[in-house]
Design a protein with these regions (language model features):
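Glycine-rich phosphate-binding loops that contact phosphosugars or nucleotide phosphates
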Residues: 316-458, 462-465, 545-588, 609, ...
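Conserved short alpha-helical segments that host acidic/polar catalytic motifs at enzyme active sites
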Residues: 16, 21-272, 276, 288-320, ...
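Generic C-terminus detector
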Residues: 568, 593-634
Length: 634
């Protein structure tokens, strides 16, 4: 029997719990290790690199030579570290660890991972959702299995027990045939103490060789300290590892040959590097992310995107572009629509990935679909990609993580070389995605004869100046911090813009609300009179973005409308547009650049504003409540 202990280390027993409340959510992180080193410190270190994914509880399991010892803790990893003295009190060189976002069963001591079978001889950690778990649970209960948690993961442990007859691989393949949904699994069998199993279906998982062992993880940052060469596990694949070997199998137990992928990310890029928060550090890394994304693709005054895999004739044959994404990536897609249509004269549709796959989209010959995702694992975007391919579209993925699912499944992939992004609220990956869109639109426009050599050269020169201009805006942070401190108690903040400026407003609003928890919405300024203006009252902050000269007069008119009704107006506009000062109470000027590139500059003060409002309110900037970095379930 298990003894449950609260906030106390009982060396003779194996289960330990602590408490903290959190909302139901969707994201998890897995780390597993087998080798010559002590497992627990490696598990804790790896899980700490996955904290950005969000979690409400954490746990590790280690085989200590005679039994599998499990330690679970609600709340932050530091509680788990304190309970185990940074893992030193858990001997053993085989283990699995987990950070959990609740999906089935509330965040609680019992529901935290790892989970085990009735005699604690099989231990499992799981990312994803088992859609038929209630049906499986009912059948297992009918056979005498008892459940102590409300999770779908415990069903996996008991199902393994039901099928296990001494052959772990056989048991794993049998449960895979029974389970419906998405999952990444790490599994330990007590009577096979020299083996660690990893399984994947629709939830990301990587494995890699370390010095003296092997490691599994949900994402690259967890393994950078130990290896740069990883294997990306594909759907319905199984990995059997010992400390010296790694074997890959299909769901039908057929052996597989796989090639590793080398990861060039700097290990220090996954650390704070002296900054107070990852988000602040990553904001300051935006100049480098912009440079690293465009520099390799501009050669001798020409845009060269070899990974696009398209001839000039094929580019000229594109009749429509559909852009599919979620969150901030969707906002870069909205920006891209204005640029592609303005420069290349190609009609563009922009869809939320969660809507695209269910609306029966019309994809005709000559349609190109662009799927955007920082992680390359976003579930809705991945499903949309598969739907587009099924309908015959050519699919280009724009992703940041090398070897990710979208990168592997798209016809072609264009990487944004932003490096690992840890903060949940994206900054540098967003900026790199914008640059990828700029390059694509300019390339298409030039090939299709809509952009001449002289115009292209001028735009490339403006693009080269962007990193320096971004850095200049970042160095103006004190002014923005002082202004942000005036709005720490704001109830509502609204963002307005027209054209590309509306796309900027969408992202500025999202940045603010996701990390400060202040209600915020972005509106196309022309829609104010159709209902939104009724929300404006005395003292309401309205952020107006106006970077498009042809829309200055219209925007200033909108600013006067809200100001007349008591709003305090903050404006973000181009240097030299002093007319705006007649309608704004506070103005932030950005350097002059090509009108299609203004998003890259106007977003910087809005990122800083959101950051400093959040800091002033005492919010967790890097890990805001109820959010995950990469949403890998629907």
């Amino acid at each position: 029997m298990l003894q449950v202990c609260y906030n106390t280390w009982k060396s003779a027993k194996k289960i330990h719990f602590c408490a903290k409340k959190r909302e139901d959510l969707i994201m998890c992180g897995i780390v597993g290790y087998i080798g010559e080193s002590q497992a627990a410190p490696i598990l804790l270190d790896g899980l700490s690199k996955l904290e950005y994914r969000g979690y409400d509880s954490a746990g590790i399991a280690v085989y200590n030579g005679t039994e599998i010892e499990v330690v679970k803790s609600k709340g932050r990893l530091k509680v788990l570290s304190e309970m185990t003295h940074d893992g030193s009190m858990m001997p053993g060189t085989l283990g699995i660890g987990h950070t959990r976002w609740a999906t089935h069963g509330e965040p609680s001591d019992i529901n935290a991972h790892p989970h085990f079978n009735k005699d604690e001889s099989i231990v499992v950690v799981h990312n994803g959702i088992i859609e038929n778990y209630l049906k499986l649970k009912k059948k297992l209960e009918a056979k005498g299995y008892q459940f102590i948690s409300d999770t779908d993961t415990e069903v996996i442990a008991h199902l393994l027990d039901y099928y296990y007859t001494g052959n772990p691989l056989q048991a794993v393949t049998k449960i895979m045939h029974r389970m419906e949904g998405s999952y990444a699994l790490g599994i330990i069998f007590r009577d096979h103490p020299d083996e660690l199993y990893a399984v994947r279906k629709d939830s990301p998982l990587i494995v890699g060789h370390t010095e003296g062992g092997n490691i599994i993880a949900s994402d690259v940052p967890a393994v950078l300290k130990y290896t740069r060469d990883v294997f990306f596990i594909e759907n319905e694949e199984i990995v059997r590892m010992t400390k010296d070997s790694m074997e890959f199998f299909t769901v039908d137990e057929e052996p597989l040959e796989k090639e590793s992928t080398h990861i060039d990310w700097d290990v220090n890029a996954a650390e704070k590097g002296g900054y107070e928060h990852f988000m602040l550090k990553e904001m300051y890394e935006q100049p480098k992310a912009i440079t690293d994304t465009f520099s390799p693709r501009v050669k001798e005054g020409k845009i060269v995107i070899d990974e696009l895999g398209m001839t000039d004739e094929e580019i000229r044959g594109i009749k429509k572009i559909m852009i599919v994404a979620c969150g901030s990536a969707y906002h870069t897609g909205v920006t891209s629509k204005y640029i592609f249509e303005g420069l290349a004269r190609i009609p563009v549709e922009v869809d939320l990935a969660s809507e695209f796959r269910y609306r029966d989209p019309i994809i005709e010959e000559g349609t190109m679909v662009i799927v955007i995702s920082q992680s390359g694992e976003t579930a809705d975007s991945l499903a949309a990609l598969r739907e587009a391919k099924k309908r015959g579209a050519r699919v280009l993925g724009i992703v940041n993580v090398v070897g990710s699912s979208i990168a592997r499944e798209a016809d072609n992939v264009m990487y944004t070389w932003a490096g690992p992004e840890i903060a949940v609220a994206t900054t540098k990956a967003y900026s790199a995605q914008l640059v990828a869109h700029y390059l694509l639109a300019m390339k298409f426009a030039h090939v299709r004869g809509k952009l001449g050599d002289t115009e292209l050269a001028a735009m490339l020169e403006d693009l080269r100046r962007l990193p320096e201009q971004v850095e200049m805006l970042l160095n103006n942070k004190q002014k923005i911090q002082k202004f942000a401190n005036r709005y720490l108690a704001a109830r509502d903040i609204f963002f307005i813009g027209r054209g590309i400026d509306y796309a900027i407003s969408l992202e500025g609003s999202l940045k603010l609300k996701e990390i400060s928890y202040i209600h915020s919405e972005a509106y196309a300024a022309g829609e104010l009179k159709h209902g939104t203006i009724s929300l404006i009252e005395e003292g309401t902050l309205v952020s107006a973005v106006l970077t498009q000269p042809e829309l200055y007069k219209k925007m200033i008119s909108n600013m006067v409308e809200v100001k007349t009704r008591g709003a305090f107006v903050m404006a973000v506009t181009n240097t030299g547009n002093t007319e705006v000062e007649k309608a704004a109470d506070y103005v932030i000027y950005i350097p002059k650049t090509n009108k299609y590139f203004t998003n890259s500059l106007a977003i910087i003060p809005l990122q800083l504003f959101g950051y400093y409002v959040s800091i002033g309110r005492g919010c967790d900037v890097d890990k805001p409540r109820n959010l995950a970095k990469s949403v890998t379930v629907e």
